[in-house]
Amino acid sequence: MAVTFSRLFGFAMVVVATLALAGCGGIMPKSSSLRASQSLKSATLTKLKDMGSSPGQAMMIRLFKQTNEFEVWKRTTAGTYKLFKTYEICAYSGTLGPKIKEGDRQAPEGFYNITPGLMNPNSSYYLSFDTGFPNKFDRAYGRTGSDLMVHGDCSSRGCYSMTDEAIAEIYALVRESFAGGNPVVQMQIYPFRMTPQRLAAYSTNPNIGFWQNLKEGYDRFELAKMPPSWDVCEKKYVFDLKREDGSPLEAAAACPPRSNDSLWTALQAKQAADDAVYKTEVAAISSREAKNAAAVQAEAEAKAAAKARGDAMGNFVGGLFGGGQPAPAETPTEAPASGGGAPVPAPAPKGT
């Protein structure tokens, strides 16, 4: 009995020491089975308090591929969300654009809901949680893929990877948000910040229509600092749009009419202003590209003309010094036949 108590006491001391280490600034080793339950650092708790939030408050995540940014936003006592911290994404697979099919090594883009069932405390990449790909939108287009994660270990094959220290804190923040009674953490994944200037730079990209669809959700958050609700109808993302009875929308069916949208007027004004900037930027880019193409063409034509002049001068000079066209060869004259090869005698002089 004494031995058993001693072992239990020793185990408890290890747990306390490990949790204390995590709380003081370190993180548990990958070998620890308790790494998923490690406490938030004291500095993290202080920062949350100073911004008017707490671990149990709701949170939202935004990712930007182009700049490798992973943002965590927390709801404050005012009801709106504030940026808590921006982490650097170690790596993600593929290029800008959504994931289409299993094995394409693309990291997803779009709107995803992280739920407790997507958390993986036993990840071989320190800690991880699933993005929830494919979501309702992805399935409407027949997109395939599985186990698209946010994880540690700083390596990626279709996922978003973070440092172990970063994923330890992010995982704990998500866990505590669930513990506070919030059933979902919304994750918004973008190729870049959805400004009209950035969109204009990719106006010829085949994904431009998809990105412009995502922009409405981006704009709604920028205006209200509240995560928009999202759903899918007519095979596109829609935001803050519900049926009167609150039932889910059908992904390929017609969208219901919009009503009681408090952001609609402000959103329309923002979109109109952004659209004007977008068109101006696209026109400016097209003009620059046309000028560059004309300059390249002019340079190529100038080089060709210079070469032609050089060739002509070379031929002219060569002609002056016999280096032009060669004279036609003379036809050799054959000796007359000798009738067997003996010499023909000269005729005798007349009158002799």
Q: Residues of each region from the PLM?
A:
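Bacterial N-terminal signal peptides that target proteins for export
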Residues: 1-13
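N-terminal post-signal-peptidase region of extra-cytosolic proteins
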Residues: 42-60, 72-74, 91-102, 109-115, ...
